[in-house]
Amino acid sequence: MNKDNKVIQLDQSFSKSGGEGQVTLIKNSQALYGKETVAKEYFKTPDQDKKAKISYMTSVDATSLLDVTAWPIDAIFEKQSKQLVGYIMPYTGAREPIHNLYTPTSRMKHFPRANWKFLLFVAVNVARAFSKVHKAGHLIGDVNHSNILVGTDSKVVLIDTDSFQVRAPKKTYLCDVGVKDYLPPELFGKNLKQVVRSQNHDNFSLSIILFQILFLGRHPFMGRMTTGEDVSLEAAVERLLYAFSSNARGNHVQPPPPHMSFQSTDLPRYVSDLFERSFSKKCLTSGRPSASEWATSLDKLRRELVECTSNSNHHHAKGMSCAFCRLDQERIKKNRSPIFGTPTKGKSGGLLRRAPQKKRPIRAPQKVSPLQGTTPLALSQLAPEAEFHNLSGVIGPETYVERLKQSGGAALAVLVAVGLLDSGAVFLGLLGPAAWLGMATIQRVKSLGWAPQHAAWMLLPGVNVGLAIYLAMAKRKM
């Protein structure tokens, strides 16, 4: 029952277990609260301090926080003993933990239309959510990537609010838990049950979350020591070995190489400088960027984003090069999916989905008059399932050649395909500069239908300016 002695009807068909308790949808929430709500029932009877904290949180006007937090709006009492056993909070809807935005695989599964512009929207919303909590006089405290939920609308909700540090008129209810990956180093080794946290502590944790959003899951202290020393992530945080710092070499640490990771130099200075301040030893006591400062700067970056001229699914700051073209080139070499999926045609509008790839039937080569022991092939016969990866996605050979014809006159001059005795194929391409820039790799060629003793080749028209040679090996699965 709730504090008004009204019976709470639980819908056991929608129930999830957490670390502290069970969260269940309330059947009669519309009648009781006029909106969808859930009940969190503790596995263990909470202590007196926790009960007092929940009682206070449910008694204050938290209207300004309800759109960004799962703030308790009512308490749950056991019917017989009248003991507080949990609380009621707004239902957050279909949202995912923020870490599901970090990697291409989890993004494609949970946020298939997300690109970096979307991630920037999320980062702004995270900073604004922190700012609202801070303005209300409270702190998140236990910041980690599991208690920040994100929807496909980019809106953010902070959960586990009963662990917040809550300021009441006569008492401050502390946050006695924390995750070391996000805990500021000045709190390492401290008894959190006795620590009154400050906004500067929250600001450190917020900066790590924002870094992971923008850097696609990278932790700011996950670098490599140039001295060969083996340093754990926890030790790196404690020593403030910020791997992406402009002074990283002075600390004998370096980030992953540019072809493998987003870099601080891929951000405008007014953003990268905030990370420098966040993870600087000078800011151990004060001076880390506030949540509102982060929100302002990230929103400025969001408004200054431009769409990449080579890939409609990539975005970058105005006047800067596209980091994701650089990263995708390396991923394609390793036969891995693009960071943000295949671009769609036209403008992105901030959210794109992976364009479905049409499977075309394999066609046998036409029989034509042999030429010097070879069988010439028409373009339509040339690897109907070959995938040409360029900066604008995966295209077929016909589309690729058409794009080359429009690329400024320097087009593909000669394409020679040689059948091998082991059923594989080698493509040797002589490319003009525009063609060379346009194509990242030929991913695979299969089922060409060539006899092993034959070679197939074709001359394509075009002006060849400055030849470059590209060799790709494609093994056909038997």
Regions found by a protein language model. Give the residues of each.
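Membrane-cytosol interface at the C-terminal ends of transmembrane alpha helices
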Residues: 429-453, 458-478
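Conserved C-lobe activation region of Hanks-type protein kinase-like domains
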Residues: 199-201, 210-272
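Regulatory extensions appended to serine/threonine kinase catalytic cores
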Residues: 289, 293-299, 303-379
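ATP-binding glycine-rich phosphate-binding loop
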Residues: 1-34, 40, 48, 66-67
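Catalytic-loop of the protein kinase fold
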Residues: 130, 134-153
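Activation segment/activation loop of eukaryotic-type protein kinase catalytic domains
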Residues: 146-188
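Conserved end of the kinase activation segment
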Residues: 187-200
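Conserved structural core of kinase catalytic domains
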Residues: 67-122
